[in-house]
Amino acid sequence: MYQPEFPPVPFRLGLYPVVDSVQWIERLLDAGVRTLQLRIKDQRDEEVEADVVAAIALGRRYNARLFINDYWRLAIKHQAYGVHLGQEDLQATDLSTIRAAGLRLGVSTHDDMEIDVALAARPSYIALGHVFPTQTKQMPSAPQGLEQLARHVERLADYPTVAIGGISLARAPAVIATGVGSIAVVSAITQAADWRLATAQLLEIAGVGDE
């Protein structure tokens, strides 16, 4: 049963681009995307704070669900919609502080054991990856594939889920067909020959999410 210890999110979050700049956040919000994540890696809080502030302000202006990857203190300070954490960040993060601040929490998983860890934290949503081989980041685990993804989605039938990892425009329909509530994409948009067209096509497949 879906009883998170953090504020809930819609069961279907729809298309969920993960991008590394405020410029991309603004572009995608303007293109109709309503769930996004700002993921800037390996910088100190003071180096990313201005970008976090700007991204959160844009999210508010468009009434969107904007998640901040990793920089949870800044997300709390500036009242983001939510925070996304990887497994490696869970142990080093004060989840009770995020909870008390009223922020939603998303957690990455790569196998059944990590799903168990995520469920123990009772987050707002669980991300399932990586579905396909990905060039976006170095992954210690093997790709899950559609069959494993479908099994995880069935296991988490009451939970908002997000599929991530190597999801292209061509692969997106098969991913959505597993019943997953959202698809997170990176290069399918940011490296597309025509990002506006790619975004529109992905929105057609995954939707903007439930209200």
Swiss-Prot record:
Binding of 2-[(2R,5Z)-2-carboxy-4-methylthiazol-5(2H)-ylidene]ethyl phosphate, residues: T134, Q135, T136, G166, V186, S187
Positions bound to 4-amino-2-methyl-5-(diphosphooxymethyl)pyrimidine: Q37, L38, R39, I40, K41, N69, S108, K137
Protein name, UniProt field: Thiamine-phosphate synthase
Gene that specifies this protein: thiE
Secretion signal span: none
Annotated pathway: Cofactor biosynthesis; thiamine diphosphate biosynthesis; thiamine phosphate from 4-amino-2-methyl-5-diphosphomethylpyrimidine and 4-methyl-5-(2-phosphoethyl)-thiazole: step 1/1
Coiled coil spans: none
Assigned GO CC terms: cytoplasm
